[in-house]
């Protein structure tokens, strides 16, 4: 039997030691001091960073939000019932990330990107940070391409462009979600990817929205991020940022995306709850001092970015394409009070607002868009040419009608011109009505606007304006399908299209079939 001498043994041991590769892990650990209402106070964690993920026993994670002199206040992401005083907490050195990419389209996920629709796991190839800095001024482009919502009243009077932030504001149960969901349904063939973020809603309401999107063929290009009312305030606070990161994936690769936040009032309430539990000083309406920043840093991420930005981001893989993320935040008001704290904040951040009014909704005007208060600050440059040309008199007609209607209640005998204006206003108001889940194409909208603008509705009874419009569109779909296809394709308005629409409407009116 061969014997090793001591020098050989020491050489072998030395060689093994040199080859041994043990990465030393310096772990920053702390101890849980208290757990209450989803807020954990931790003693230690000297090197923790703001927003860093903290690991608790049992695979539960939290997020550091308060960095105090001798303790750290963290919010638990998920169930906190298993945590107790004296347990260990570890720094991870990571910030919160969620899965992103086309694999999420057609799925319903929670605020952390985990699937909750029972369709199996999501095999996302990439993840991205939930909190990101918005693109700088240099990388942005002005808004000049439209997002068609499919609503006449919005596309004609308050147009939305790609990369714009357009607020939808109004009381509860007034059609805010309906308007936003219809805008998503209208994108099913436009190539715009959509993200619907539900914050603090009933699970039955979210399930209903998902079902409607599926029925109308729009779920395949939509990601639904749900943080329902039964989930923790932390997840309701994070959901909009997670959804925004998922939408930015498409923006940064030269594609167009649309995101709906339904609604940011509930996110502000969730953030107020977290802040008060963290013992931060309350301000107006008990909201913390940084509630404006809460929404501004979210909404500034919606933008239209230049070709150079996309090229730089994709390392030259995508060239000559701009990307955009259009935001439709929703805010719920109390008794129409737009001067409350959160509504005024969001109005000042966004590029315009669509104001829905209870009185109009209750009188049967749906969508209940108040054309007087609603405005789009940048969408005009993005409006489709034919809609822009034909919708000029619509807003004026409605504004004059509302003014005269109030005046007409007191005056018994009206002159001919005033009476005509009133009747025209009534017909336009009737024409602006639209059923839910029935978005209109550019060509269909153009027919309605042309009929109103060129006086073809003057001899139509006010009660029959709706049926006249339906019959007119059906007639054109049968007899002038090529003209409609041409309008939808180009969106231009010239003498040839003008003559085509005029001749078609005149022939239709001769049939008297409405």
From Swiss-Prot:
It is a peripheral membrane protein. Its EC number is 7.1.2.2. Keywords: ATP synthesis, ATP-binding, Cell inner membrane, Cell membrane, CF(1), Hydrogen ion transport, Ion transport, Membrane, Nucleotide-binding, Translocase, Transport. It is an enzyme of class 7 (translocase). GO terms for molecular function: ADP binding; ATP binding; proton-transporting ATP synthase activity, rotational mechanism. It catalyses: ATP + H2O + 4 H(+)(in) = ADP + phosphate + 5 H(+)(out). Coiled coil: none annotated. This is ATP synthase subunit alpha. It comes from Pseudomonas aeruginosa (strain ATCC 15692 / DSM 22644 / CIP 104116 / JCM 14847 / LMG 12228 / 1C / PRS 101 / PAO1). The gene is atpA.
């Amino acid at each position: 039997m061969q014997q090793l001498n001591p020098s050989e043994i020491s050489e072998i041991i030395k060689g093994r030691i040199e080859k041994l590769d043990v990465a030393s892990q310096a772990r920053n650990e702390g101890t849980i001091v208290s757990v209450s209402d989803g807020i954990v106070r931790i003693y230690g964690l000297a090197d923790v960073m703001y927003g860093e993920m903290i690991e608790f026993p049992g695979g539960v994670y939290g997020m550091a939000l308060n960095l105090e002199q001798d303790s750290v206040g963290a919010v638990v992401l998920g169930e906190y019932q298993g945590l107790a005083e004296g347990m260990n907490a570890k720094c991870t050195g990571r910030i919160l990330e969620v899965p992103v990419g086309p694999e999420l389209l057609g799925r319903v996920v929670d605020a952390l990107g985990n699937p909750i629709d029972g369709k199996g796991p999501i095999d996302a190839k990439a993840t991205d940070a939930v909190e990101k800095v918005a693109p700088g001024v240099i990388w942005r482009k002005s808004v000049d391409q439209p997002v068609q919502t499919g609503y006449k009243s919005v596309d004609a009077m308050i147009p939305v462009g790609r990369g714009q932030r357009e607020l939808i504001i109004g009381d509860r149960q007034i059609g805010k979600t309906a308007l936003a969901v219809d805008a998503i349904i209208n994108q099913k063939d436009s190539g715009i990817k959509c993200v619907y973020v539900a914050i603090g809603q009933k699970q039955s309401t979210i399930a209903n929205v998902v079902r409607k999107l599926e029925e109308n063929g729009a779920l395949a290009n939509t990601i639904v991020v749900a943080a329902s009312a039964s989930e923790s305030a932390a997840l309701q606070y994070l959901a909009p940022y997670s959804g925004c990161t998922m939408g930015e994936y498409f923006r940064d690769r030269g594609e167009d995306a649309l995101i709906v936040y339904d609604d940011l009032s509930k996110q502000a309430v969730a953030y107020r709850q977290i802040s008060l539990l963290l013992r931060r000083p309350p301000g107006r309406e008990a909201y913390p001092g940084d509630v404006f920043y809460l929404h501004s840093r979210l909404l500034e991420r919606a933008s239209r970015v230049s070709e150079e930005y996309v090229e730089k981001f994709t390392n030259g893989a995508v060239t000559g394409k701009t990307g955009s993320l259009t935001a439709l935040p929703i805010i719920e008001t109390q008794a129409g009070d737009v001067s409350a704290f959160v509504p005024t904040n969001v109005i000042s951040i966004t590029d315009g607002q669509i104001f829905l009014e209870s009185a109009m909704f209750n009188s049967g005007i749906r969508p209940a868009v108040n054309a007087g208060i609603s405005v789009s600050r940048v969408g005009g440059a993005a409006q489709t040419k034919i809609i822009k040309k034909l919708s000029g008199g619509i807003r004026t007609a409605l504004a004059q009608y509302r003014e005269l209607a109030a005046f007409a209640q007191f005056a018994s005998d009206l002159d001919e011109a005033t009476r005509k204006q009133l009747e025209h206003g009534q017909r336009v108001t009737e024409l602006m009505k639209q059923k839910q889940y029935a978005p209109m194409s550019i060509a269909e909208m153009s027919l309605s606007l042309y009929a109103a603008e060129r006086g073809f509705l003057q001899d139509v009874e006010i009660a029959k304006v709706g049926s006249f419009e339906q019959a007119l569109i059906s007639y054109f779909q049968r007899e002038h399908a090529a003209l409609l296809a041409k309008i939808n394709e180009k969106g231009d308005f010239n003498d040839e299209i003008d003559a085509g629409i005029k001749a078609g409407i005149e022939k239709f009116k001769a049939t008297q079939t409405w």
